[in-house]
Regions:
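N-terminal leader segment of winged-helix/HTH proteins
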Residues: 1-40, 84, 106-107, 111-112
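A ubiquitous, low-specificity "background" feature that marks scattered single residues
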Residues: 48, 82-83
Length: 113
């Protein structure tokens, strides 16, 4: 079964997410960003995000060996990253294939610059 990918609209970061240095964040933006940064405060999750970003899209089964963790542990950490909006998954058979959420990393970078 072939998946259909839709083009992602490209917008300027300034149009959606002002830098914390440019203007104060409202409560909703601050909470969303805090959840994302908190998810990255764990070394395993940070490594998982970097592995997923480097591969563009990766099967959860291929994340076990690089981080030397069990499937339940990797599943827990990818769930945390997904709940923070940093990665998105697509279930294919027994496994989930992960990719970086299109705007998530850019938003974190842009909010600090």
């Amino acid at each position: 079964m072939a998946s259909t990918r839709k083009p992602v609209a490209v917008i300027e970061a300034a149009d959606c997410c002002p830098s914390v240095l440019a203007a104060p964040l409202d409560e909703a933006d601050a909470e969303r960003l805090a959840r994302r940064f908190a998810a990255l405060a764990d070394p395993i999750r940070l490594r998982l995000l970097s592995l997923i970003a480097a591969a563009d899209e990766v099967c959860a089964c291929d994340l076990l060996e690089p981080v030397d963790r069990s499937q339940p542990t990797v599943s827990h950490h990818t769930k945390q990253l997904a709940e923070a909006g940093l990665i998105v998954g697509e279930k294919r058979g027994r496994w989930t294939w992960w990719r970086v959420a299109p705007d998530a990393v850019a938003e974190l970078r842009d909010v600090l610059t």
